[in-house]
Amino acid sequence: MATTATMATSGSARKRLLKEEDMTKVEFETSEEVDVTPTFDTMGLREDLLRGIYAYGFEKPSAIQQRAIKQIIKGRDVIAQSQSGTGKTATFSISVLQCLDIQVRETQALILAPTRELAVQIQKGLLALGDYMNVQCHACIGGTNVGEDIRKLDYGQHVVAGTPGRVFDMIRRRSLRTRAIKMLVLDEADEMLNKGFKEQIYDVYRYLPPATQVVLISATLPHEILEMTNKFMTDPIRILVKRDELTLEGIKQFFVAVEREEWKFDTLCDLYDTLTITQAVIFCNTKRKVDWLTEKMREANFTVSSMHGDMPQKERESIMKEFRSGASRVLISTDVWARGLDVPQVSLIINYDLPNNRELYIHRIGRSGRYGRKGVAINFVKNDDIRILRDIEQYYSTQIDEMPMNVADLI
């Protein structure tokens, strides 16, 4: 077991400056034994997996992939912290696929994610990367037919990705057998280990074989989460990014001062006219606000789509499909969208409401400049929000300036 003291020591950690196009000036504070593997070819991956990786469009591993994949494949417990858009999902997906015995038709890896959408995205990514391996992978998520889950699991799945509640339900019903599980992956661990999911994760963990390897991946890892990892990780390797480097480079952040809540809507309409947007996401803090704003925008003849956690699964899926394809250009959403959902064309994020906690800020704005693409984030700030904005600035050691008149030129 690693102790908290070991976690905190910088003696066993060194800082590395990476000089890569899209990862300039990101300082890793990383365990000594982590080395860099610059190409997929030199990672010792199976041939059919390499084919899948190149067919998927990957050419060169990202900074996190160069460090984490080999460690995970070696069987080490790993805490990997990487910003949104750096390829962290592919990091554990490639590692999981490498470790499977395809001949054995039993669940060998379990991936937990905080939202249904993210679980489905992970499943699709695994199937695409494992295209030449004949891998079976099922997304086990709430809001879908339990009978279908049971049928799929009975058929035999090498990997199960899912939300903690439904996964635990399937384990309890003995539909998801855990005896062959070798690896547990917690994606977006900061969100997962927040109060809501902590108990469910422990419930699932108790059913896993004692030697199960644990991999924890997230954009932010607050101190209290590192403390919790002590409970179920053994001597984990750390691959961490310093917190104050976490705001993505290439994303310009601005604020617009709106004295009162009522003024936000007009501000949004004014912006909408100014910006010939490729694709944008507008974040609100509540489902009710998402519905209200969507209706109001449509009344004003703006075309928008919207999504939040109360919508039926099918509806959310078709909205995401529409948005990904570019058929809808502006999406109004709650934080359900902020977690790891991958739409490369998004170049503008508007925080209609500042997020309720500062950890969420990076998940939201990390959307808009994926894989080193440029992006713009605009925060609507009421008089009594100034304090929250300053807190976010301080927390991420970043600067958020007042929005200039020529903001359209920056997108």
Curated annotation (Swiss-Prot):
Residues 69-239 form the Helicase ATP-binding domain. Belongs to the DEAD box helicase family. eIF4A subfamily. This is Eukaryotic initiation factor 4A-III. The modification N-acetylmethionine is found at M1. The modification N-acetylalanine is found at A2. The modification Phosphoserine is found at S10, S12. Changing T334V: Reduced incorporation into EJCs. GO terms for molecular function: ATP binding; ATP hydrolysis activity; mRNA binding; poly(A) binding; ribonucleoprotein complex binding; RNA binding; RNA helicase activity; RNA stem-loop binding. ATP binds at K60, Q65, G85, T86, G87, K88, T89, A90, D342, R367, S368, G369, R370, Y371.
